[in-house]
From Swiss-Prot:
It comes from the Eukaryota. Expressed by the venom gland. This is U4-theraphotoxin-Hhn1y. Keywords: Disulfide bond, Neurotoxin, Postsynaptic neurotoxin, Secreted, Signal, Toxin. InterPro entries: Hwtx-2-like. Belongs to the neurotoxin 12 (Hwtx-2) family. 02 (Hwtx-2) subfamily. It comes from Cyriopagopus hainanus. One of its GO terms (cellular component) is host cell postsynaptic membrane. Residues 1-22 form the signal peptide. Postsynaptic neurotoxin. Its main location: secreted.
Amino acid sequence: MKMTLIAILTCAAVLVLHTTAAEELEAESQLMEVGMPDTELEAVDEERLFECSVSCEIEREGNKDCKKKKCKGGWKCKFNMCVKV
């Protein structure tokens, strides 16, 4: 009886671990399919940095203090530019 219980619990634990690993692999493969190539991500990063610094320069030329622009999507404002966090 004791051995049967141990065998059932062991099989259940293996099944749970296997299912979790399979779900992680499936999620990773979906991210890889949906994600942008690295070159496109670099272009987006450069574009955001440029937009933030240009908008800050425009505010300065208007004799206003440069307001920290709220950056979104993993970015923060630092030194009047959007910086990837």
